[in-house]
């Protein structure tokens, strides 16, 4: 529960 959230947030915030 860290890489998934960071990846999703980074991709969405893009």
From Swiss-Prot:
Keyword presence, Ribosomal protein: yes
The UniProt record lists the keyword Hydrolase: no
Source species: Populus euphratica (Euphrates poplar)
UniProt superkingdom: Eukaryota
Name the record gives this protein: Large ribosomal subunit protein P1
Lineage: Eukaryota, Viridiplantae, Streptophyta, Embryophyta, Tracheophyta
GO cellular component entries: ribonucleoprotein complex; ribosome
Family listed: Belongs to the eukaryotic ribosomal protein P1/P2 family.
Record keywords: Ribonucleoprotein, Ribosomal protein
Coiled-coil stretches noted in the UniProt entry, renumbered to this chain: none
